[in-house]
Amino acid sequence: NQCTNSDELEKVMNENKIRGYIGFDCTAPSLHVGSLLQIMCLRLLQKYGHQPIVLLGGGTTRIGDPSGKDETRKILSEKQIEKNIKNIEKVFKIFLKTKNTKTKPIFINNYKWLSKLNYIKFLREIGKHFTINKMLSFDSVKLRLDREQSLSYMEFNYMILQAYDFLELNKTKKCLLQIGGSDQWGNIINGVDLIKRHSSKQVFGLTTPLITLASGTKMGKTEKGAVWLEKNLLSPYDYWQFWRNTDDRDVFKFLKMFTDLKIEKIEEIKNNNINDLKILLANEATAMLHGKSAAKKAEQTAKKTFDKKSVGDDLPLININKGE
């Protein structure tokens, strides 16, 4: 989507093994498929010998990211944030390999350093690099103000703290790359600029597009609610069905984004029967999260239910009271 210097980044990554990070909000009890493209980016980094850093926003979640939001988020209790962090970590341990010491993911919580900041020192050393003029120009701030919606001073500071995260990871973990959704471009640029001004080091920022379905809706939720990457919140069968119900126009794109199939293989089969491709997508995506046997079982349940008009063993059941 966007990159601060794509040619130089490619050169650096070809010549060295680097560390790259993505920050994840911890406001929800787990992650949903709206975060899956970011997870796949970390998976790709690892696949090619680089080391992913998963930054868990224990500190910034206590403030709230105003990007793309129309109103101030509800502040969660510290206990709830810690519980969310543990659940989110579990998701990454499924998608990322944790055994190879050179590429295993580094999990780090930004509360570790944000909670220790001295306010006066922070303003003198970090705040001096940010101008109100520039901060007011970012969409996350501008849109809220243009709509005459309130933006707290706490939220206004979010972009500075995110930039500081990159500086901290660069200093302590030699991290050279931050990846995020396209709505994070302004925050990422702030981090790149801060490091350049603070230590004259070259680092990079890269964004991925926000995935919009062919229907025009944002990826991550359905009429039934969020498509969670957690079997206690969404059954493997329902997860399989989400992918099986992909719009025809999105199937080819999703096979490239959300499976480990090689591009050559996807190109080779792209003209196959669309329903066969949807089943392939559902099986590959479900196997990655829940395992091959769960994917196969979900497919068999769907076949029994829809082809043979019988009820499969793992079809989710809902109890309805007689009066309802």
Locations of regions flagged by a protein language model:
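Short acidic, glycine/serine/threonine-rich loops at helix termini
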Residues: 64-68, 117-123, 217-223
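N-terminal regions that are enriched for targeting/export leaders
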Residues: 1-6
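Divalent-metal (Mg2+/Mn2+/Ca2+)-assisted nucleotide/phosphate chemistry catalytic cores
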Residues: 77-78, 84, 94-207
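N-terminal catalytic cores of NTP/NDP-binding nucleotidyl/phosphoryl-transfer enzymes
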Residues: 8-66, 178-185
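Short, hydrophobic/aliphatic alpha-helical segments
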Residues: 15-23, 45, 52, 163-172, ...
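A charged helix-plus-loop insertion that forms the helical arch/lid used to bind
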Residues: 66-82
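Conserved nucleotide- and phosphate/pyrophosphate-binding catalytic cores
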Residues: 197-324
